[in-house]
Amino acid sequence: MKINWRRNLLISWIGCFFTGASFSLVMPFLPVYIEQLGTAKSQVELFSGLAISVTAFSAAIVSPLWGSLADRKGRRLMMIRAAAGMTITMGSLAFVTNVYWLLIMRFMTGVLSGYIPNATALIASQVPKQKSGWALGTLATGAVAGNLIGPLIGGMLAQWFGLRNVFIITGIILLICTILTVFMVKEDFQPVEKEDVISMAELRKRIHYMPILIGLFISTLILQVGATSISPILTLYIRDLSGSSSNALVVSGLIVSIAGVSAIASSPALGKIGDRVGNHKVLLAGLVLSLFCFIPMAFVKTPFQLGVLRFFLGFSTGALMPSINTLISKISPPEGVSRIFSYNQMFNNFGQVIGPMLGSTVAHGFGYPAVFLVTSACVFGNIILSVFNFRKLLVTKTKI
């Protein structure tokens, strides 16, 4: 079967954008919706936090299971399963009658997710190796754009159509993504019987760069911790910097989005540079840049200064995403690539759980600026680990 990987990339990008957006679009109005479900005001914050974190947590737990199934049945089938499953769970949120049903459906959304890692594995297995950095960098912008634009879309839809209708509209959009994936995405995959699938022990033996792979998982975790650790305190930090709360929500939205703009704009180009000079070098450069962005964030005096640093931080994200995914695709044996990407997604999801918890805990104990310093320490540790893992490649000036 002749595979048009460029068309697969386009449809996968659309799917990654809307599945990524569906995770984040509830952020602006979720506390209000929980309150409308009859929850006591004293418990709204608790249940809001649970409703957000339970999705990432359940997705992290089941991700390896779906990855293993993808290696047996195919990545396209898992993309269809994830899109169809999220169509049902997101749409059903419009009909929940209490906060406990909301938590159950948010939990099931995470359980049935997995579109993004399987799309990544699909494209990684089909794209020519010399274009893998560019292709995976382009694909990564879909998930990032969806995650960052999701709250804006959700807020606008809630304003225009009401809270419950947002979930119905989201379900319809995800249904369209399901249909596009069914009819437009192609994969030449021969199903493998369960007894013929290589074990994890055998898969580990076939990975020649295991320390590097573990380091890439940690980089994914740190990337998400850094991205989400400020989410509980950003609006409050901006209010303190500006001395006013009148426009703190608007400014915080702009500051969050500005990092996404630079990440989306730079990721394909940085992926292409990685194809030429070595993805490990681009990854190290991205980590160093993020360190030099996080440290001064603790000492800014105005929201504008914070916004400038967030803009440059986006270039770091644009460097890290394609580099991590491309290196994983090159390290992973073809018969286990979906499982490897599913473990990377597990670390990604755990980062989304750990980040807000770390940020709120540090801010409560030591103040808002300390959040950026603790995040910087995590990034610095990641740099040391990455330099150690890449030392032979750096000395011999070779690439994977």
How would you label these PLM feature ranges?
Residues 89, 100-108, 293, 304-312:
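Paired small-residue
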Residues 178-195, 388-398:
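Helix-loop junctions on the cytosolic side of multi-pass membrane transporters
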Residues 1-6, 187-216, 400:
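Juxtamembrane intracellular "pre-TM" segments in multi-pass secondary transporters
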Residues 105-143, 326-327:
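Cytoplasmic helix-loop-helix junction between adjacent transmembrane helices
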Residues 50-66, 257-268:
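Central cavity-lining transmembrane alpha-helices of secondary-active solute carriers
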Residues 29-45, 233-250:
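Short amphipathic helix-loop junctions that connect adjacent transmembrane helices
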